[in-house]
Design a protein with these regions (language model features):
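ATP-dependent carboxylate activation and anion-phosphoryl transfer catalytic cores
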Residues: 1-206, 214-215, 272, 279-286, ...
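Compact, charge-rich alpha-helical regulatory domains located at protein termini
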Residues: 170, 209, 223, 717-719
Length: 807
């Protein structure tokens, strides 16, 4: 082996016997984790080995003194905690097995396992500050023991509840086979939590300091101990350095983690750097705190790390010290040499306060870290730390329904009628008032989490039940009249006066499908000049009225020539990397410069709507349905995609073909028995006649469930009826399993319940790797590609770097 190698072992729990599971002669997903956990840059060292260096010739960048053949030594403990998407997919099977289901992860560093575990639970953003999970508190002891047998995403919380109740370790170990060492450490946390709960309003200094040492936050201690004041106010953490050598050698890496046990090595490091700069006659730099986006999850992915990293680079290029805070080991932002300093800690107010106390920054940036960073804006405002860019009040104005409606009134911009509700009765009354269908969502969410279109009162009742069960009801639920039309999106850069729109994006799927799940095209293909002018005008009004400095994302619905606003987000969005790459406009760079006081007019990219690029770029979402059992593949207003690909070509058709192939769609030549299955809702049936006719002319045999089949035959498209999932054999399942079905088109019975026939059909198609199309517009796009004579060899390559070179 020359370079990286990943080995996985199985260790027998009661001896030192082990077996090799697999060996991968390459760097792996765990290589990134190991690099961040140890400070040892595995990929960089592997690259140097690949070009001819040996380990003893490679210097350790962290210490600057040792070579790469010194194996890292750790004087801390690291916990990696997966981020699963089950908070979005409430009906999904949460069982864990040999197939990976996590969308991301967090990493935490502590002086003890207990402290690291508490940090990890706080970082994972489940609304928990200890390992106590409320649903388990309501179970009996027998139910807890029974649930220990369930190997799912919540098992660690079930074990913790069992330990709190005094269920013996032997019983837990026999069921779970979780090592006794972990059980002992979790028992310690459980004992600390129970001890705090017994304080009854009297908390000793020793209890408080012990709780802090093992990872309990101040707000948690106050809640558990039922106290209003703590024995020590503003008891701040110190920071230790990740140095790869357990302090055996002096190190100069700016990579820290918090601890309540020891000296503040970060403060010493900062003082030494500042003294060195002063001795060399260098002016003191402005310090800016940059918040990352935490774990990768559906709706908040690697796009925000792109924004955070580009923000840091621009700050450094303009004479600022950029200090990064993040907890995701998979990101570039948590490379120790990306920023001037890195703090690997949770993104919550207390952790941030500790960093601020040590760093004493001049300002912070919240607009590039997604909703995770935006949630810190209010706290930053309260403690008086200036926010570079759009102020916290403007962020709240865009998120708060009533204030946003007032903003629209001032701007004279139309939107769909909507209401704010807090319970089921109010929701039903609002649905009656504004008329069904309605779009329902909790406020302050990203990725359309728990967002749905309710077509009936029964839907309203079901969805309010889902929302109230899975969402903190401190924030209201928003109901909007659902408008059918074309959805468009813009990301704009603003300097407080002028604005620049690099381009207008159009979603191929109409409104009602989350923009993150829709095929997206730049430049927009079907807007009139009047509609484009209106979108530009409205975006400018928002930018000026909200006093946006930096980035703003606005989503519009265009229906019958009228432009409605869907939402405004005064922050970076998931489309910023996409639109930056395909237009050649370095959006984050320009936005940061605006935040630092520069004007757009002086940056060389103009203002208003930027001229269109000479290419068409299509963004196609990628899904992971085969890994998430029980999740309905039906498109809707809640985002489900886990990634995306880009297709770029001189025209829309070729770009779409590239994108669909990149996303894993297959384009088969139909055989003599090849067939397609149709089962579509009534409102979609007229549009599917043309789609079905095109497939028939290509040589496909068509099958449909009773209603769809009758409709197609009525409109002169020959179709064969097939029984539904619950029908007698041979039914639609037998047809799917025959190996003859190339495509399934299913848009019927929107809903999350996995017991519904339509959901089961779509799941079966996924399990059999049969493409399942759940939106009319996606079906049209796919069929038009199928009908074309083009293949990849006919489509020219496009080097998007040329877009930048022309500037």
């Amino acid at each position: 082996i020359e370079g990286g190698c990943n080995c996985q072992f199985a260790l027998k729990p009661d001896s030192f016997d082990y077996a090799v599971i697999e060996v991968n002669p390459r760097v792996s997903r765990s290589s990134a984790l190991a690099s961040k956990a140890t400070g040892y840059p595995i990929a960089k060292v592997a690259t140097k080995i690949a070009i001819g260096y040996t380990l003893d010739e490679i210097t350790n960048d962290v210490t600057g003194k040792t070579c790469a053949c010194f194996e890292p030594a750790l004087d801390y403990i690291v916990v990696k905690y997966p981020k699963w998407p089950f908070d979005k997919f409430v009906y999904a099977d949460k069982s864990l097995g040999t197939q990976m289901m996590a969308t991301g992860e967090v990493m935490s560093i502590g002086n003890s396992f207990e402290a690291a575990m508490m940090k990890a639970v706080s970082s994972i953003e489940l609304g928990m500050d200890t390992l106590t999970h409320k649903p388990f508190e309501e179970l009996t002891d027998d139910e807890i023991v029974a649930h220990l047998h369930v190997q799912d995403a919540e098992r660690v919380f079930c074990v913790y509840e069992a330990l709190k109740r005094g269920i013996d370790h032997e019983t837990i170990w026999k069921i779970t086979k979780i090592d006794w060492w972990f059980l002992d450490k979790m028992q310690h946390l459980a004992d600390l939590e129970k001890g705090l709960a017994k304080c009854n309003g009297v908390l000793s200094l020793e209890q408080y300091q012990t709780a802090k040492k093992y990872g309990f936050q101040d707000k948690t201690i106050k809640r558990l101990a039922q106290v209003d004041a703590l024995p020590v106010e503003n008891y701040r953490a110190g920071f230790k350095m990740v140095d790869t050598c357990a302090a055996e050698f002096s190190a100069n890496t700016p990579y820290f983690y918090s601890t309540y046990d020891g000296d503040n090595e970060a403060a010493e490091f900062i003082a030494a750097r500042e003294a060195e700069a002063a001795a060399n006659g260098q002016p003191k730099k402005k310090k800016v705190l940059v918040f990352g986006s935490g774990p990768i999850r559906i709706g908040q992915g690697i796009e925000f790390d792109y924004c955070s990293v580009h923000c840091v680079w621009t700050l450094k290029n303009h004479g600022c010290e950029a200090i990064l805070v993040n907890n995701n080991p998979e990101t570039v932002s948590t490379d120790f040499d990306t920023g001037d300093r890195l703090y690997f800690d949770p993104l919550n107010p207390e952790s941030v306060d500790n960093i601020i106390a040590t760093e004493k920054p001049d300002a912070c940036v919240v607009q590039f870290g997604g909703q995770t960073a935006i949630k810190l804006a209010k706290h930053m405002d309260e403690i008086g730390l200036p926010i570079l860019g759009t102020p916290a009040d403007a962020i709240d104005e865009a998120e708060d329904r009533e204030r946003f409606d007032e903003l629209l009134e001032r701007c004279k911009i139309p939107r769909a009628p909507g209401r704010t509700v807090f319970n089921l009765e109010e929701a039903l009354a609002a649905a009656d008032e504004i008329g069904l269908p309605v779009l329902m969502r909790p406020s302050y969410v990203l990725g359309g989490q728990n967002m749905i279109v309710a077509y009936t009162k029964a839907d309203v009742i079901e969805y309010m039940g889902v929302i109230t069960e899975h969402v903190d009801m401190d924030h209201p639920v928003l109901l909007d009249k659902y408008i059918m039309g074309t959805e468009c999106e813009v990301d704009a850069i603003c300097d407080g006066e002028n604005f620049l729109i690099p381009g207008i994006m159009e979603q191929v799927e109409r409104t009602g499908v989350h923009s993150g799940d829709s095929i997206c095209v730049y430049p927009a293909q079907h807007l009139t000049q009047a509609e484009i002018d209106t979108i530009v005008d409205y975006t400018g009004r928002f930018a000026r009225e909200l006093h946006v400095t930096g980035l703003v994302n606005v989503q519009y619905a265009v229906s019958n020539g009228k432009v409605y606003v869907i939402e405004v987000n005064p922050r970076s969005s998931r489309t910023v990397p996409y639109i930056s790459k395909v237009t050649g406009v370095p959006m984050v760079d320009l936005a940061v410069r605006c935040c630092l006081g520069e004007k757009l007019a002086d940056m060389g990219y103009g203002t208003g709507l930027h001229p269109n690029a000479p290419y068409v770029a299509v963004k196609v979402p990628v899904f992971s349905f085969e890994k998430l059992h029980g999740v309905d593949t039906q498109f809707g207003p809640e985002m489900k995609s886990t990634g995306e690909v880009l297709g770029i070509a001189p025209n829309f058709h070729d770009a779409l073909l590239k994108g669909l192939i990149g996303a894993g769609y297959t384009f088969k030549t139909p055989g003599p028995a090849s067939c397609c299955i149709f089962t579509v809702k009534d409102s979609d049936k007229p549009e599917f006649v043309d789609i079905a006719w095109k497939l028939k002319n290509m040589g496909y045999k068509l099958y449909g469930t009773s209603g769809t089949c009758a409709w197609l035959n009525k409109h002169m498209v020959p179709c064969n009826e097939v029984r539904n999932m619950s029908g007698e054999a041979p039914n639609i399942v037998d047809l799917l399993q025959s190996g003859l079905v190339d495509y399934v088109f299913s848009t019927s019975a929107k809903g999350r319940d996995p017991k519904r026939d339509s959901v089961r059909l779509r799941r079966k198609a996924v399990e059999l790797s049969i493409p399942c199309i759940t939106a009319v517009d996606t079906a049209n796009a796919l069929v038009n590609c199928l009908r074309s004579d083009h293949s990849m060899k006919d489509i020219p390559l496009v080097d998007i770097a040329t877009l930048y070179h022309k500037k």
